Regions:
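ACP-dependent fatty acid/polyketide chain-elongation machinery
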Residues: 1-77, 99, 120, 258-270, ...
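Flexible, low-complexity linker/loop segments at domain and module junctions
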Residues: 1-18, 104-111, 304-310, 341, ...
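Conserved catalytic cysteine-centered active-site region
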Residues: 4, 8-13, 47-90, 96, ...
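Condensing-enzyme catalytic core mediating Claisen C-C bond formation in acyl metabolism
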Residues: 15-19, 43-46, 227-304, 312-313
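Conserved small-residue
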Residues: 20, 38, 92, 116, ...
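Short, well-ordered amphipathic alpha-helical segments that serve as non-catalytic structural scaffolds
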Residues: 88-99, 156, 183, 256, ...
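Phosphate/pyrophosphate-binding loops at sites that engage ATP/ADP/AMP, CoA/4′-phosphopantetheine
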Residues: 95-110, 260-267, 296-313, 335-339
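Acyl-CoA/ACP chain-elongation machinery
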Residues: 195-241, 274-288, 316-326, 342-392
């Protein structure tokens, strides 16, 4: 056993299981439709004109949600929430029901043992921009009184907390594109430390706005393959040239194993470890060689009491940027060394686009599903793996995972140098 991998959680720490899953993405408005479309090679990317009706066209590639969350929630609730919070509510409601609570408010009892953690990247930015436009064109008297609540980064978390009556803590990590994964790391800590029996955790984002898209374009982060929307985002591909933005949410019900067993809950999988690091290299570029990512994966494995040889699957962050994908691949080579070819790697952002603060949570749901169904999801747009990547990347068809106990890692990275890795195991 490598000395960098210890024995996992300390004696007496409580195990965490996943009892509920929720998704809303460009492939579907819930978990079954999204998972089915992903395994079938679906892609939610399209050309979208974000321009004003009377103004010039502002056409970008994007992966808008398949289902408008405002049509799922009550009209009153939708009117009082930013779109990012709407996504969070829709996905959280599905996750809570999937966990065996038909009425979300019945989850909490008196609420003292239930917590919520929802990560965001840009949060209510689009609502802020809408209100700024109203201020400039109609005057201060037309600005919504909800402007301040919906612009706060904790808006989505607060709305989910209200829905389930959480009183053990409502938190909102803001760590760019690693925020959804960091939310799950916090949830694991709360379960282990005994601060909560149930944590509704995940990430959400609704930032498809021309200002955001123009900003990423100026950073040269977006794919310029406008004539081929379905093939534009190509994680790990030799011809990758940037990502496509998406929107949506992923939410999980993370529960202490003892609490889940006591109520006879179905268990989808186990959240066994988390690692959080920072590159401290550059605000918008990964450190060469991916040392921060490697350290996060090492930390997650150590936290889970695993060695690299026990991992069969990785759901990679893989945004399809030339530097980002290469650095992540180098990090995985560093961790798994000679055994890297035995690890089946999925890169799914070609289907969903990059959902920023929601990405880590959406991909955590996919990782749990992959272990549950023993199926690694495909990369819908992959044509040829970059030889410099050198990973066993799943192509355009799903890949079967081996028999026996399964364990996986999901990686997330974000501007500011954030790195988060989560370790999962199957329900057995």
């Amino acid at each position: 056993m490598s000395p960098r991998h210890a024995a996992g959680p300390a004696p007496g720490e409580r195990a965490a299981v996943v009892t509920g899953l929720g998704l809303t993405t460009s492939l579907g408005g819930d978990v079954p439709s999204t998972w089915r479309a992903l395994l079938d090679g679906g892609c939610g990317v399209e050309r979208v004109d974000f321009g004003e009706p009377a103004g010039p066209a502002q056409v970008y590639l994007a992966a808008p949600a398949a289902v408008d969350p405002g049509t799922v929630l009550s009209s009153a609730k939708a009117a009082h929430c930013d779109r990012s919070a709407q996504f969070a509510l829709v996905a959280a409601r599905e996750a809570v029901r999937d966990a065996g609570f038909p009425d979300p408010s019945a989850l909490a009892g008196d609420g003292s043992r239930v917590a919520v953690v929802v990560g965001v990247g840009l949060g209510g930015l689009t609502s802020v921009l809408e209100q700024d436009h109203r201020l400039r064109t109609q005057g201060a008297g037309r600005v919504s009184p909800r402007t301040i609540p919906v612009m706060l980064p904790n808006h989505a978390a607060a709305e989910v907390g209200l829905m389930v009556g959480a009183k053990a803590g409502v938190h909102a990590p803001v760590s760019a594109c690693a925020a959804g994964a960091e939310a799950l790391a916090q949830a694991l800590g709360m379960i282990r430390d005994g601060r909560a029996d149930i944590v509704v955790a995940g990430g959400t984002e609704a930032a498809l706005h021309p200002l955001v898209l123009a900003g990423f374009a100026r950073l040269r982060a977006l794919s310029r393959r406008h004539d081929d929307p379905k093939g534009a985002s190509r994680p790990f591909d030799a011809d990758r040239d940037g990502f496509v933005m998406g929107e949506g949410a992923g939410m999980l019900v993370v529960e202490s194993a003892a609490h889940a067993a006591a109520r006879g809950a179905r268990v989808h999988g186990r959240l066994t470890g988390a690692g959080i690091t920072n590159d401290s290299h550059h605000v918008a570029q990964p450190a060469p060689g991916g040392p921060g990512c490697a350290a996060a994966v090492d930390a997650a494995l150590r936290d889970a009491g695993l060695v690299p040889e026990q991992i069969q699957h990785v759901n990679a962050h893989a945004t399809a940027t030339p530097l980002g994908d290469l650095g992540e691949a180098q990090a995985l080579h560093s961790v798994f060394a000679k055994g890297v070819d035995d690890v089946t790697v999925s890169a799914t952002k070609g289907a969903f686009g990059h959902t920023l603060g929601a990405a880590g949570a959406i991909e955590a749901v996919l990782t749990v599903l992959a272990l549950r169904d023993r199926t690694a999801p495909p990369a819908c747009s992959l044509e040829r793996v970059d030889p410099a990547i050198g990973l066993n990347v799943v192509g355009r068809d799903p890949a079967a995972l081996p028999c026996g106990p399964l364990a996986a890692v999901s990686t997330s990275m974000g501007f500011g140098g954030h790195n988060v890795a989560l370790a999962f195991a199957d329900a057995s």
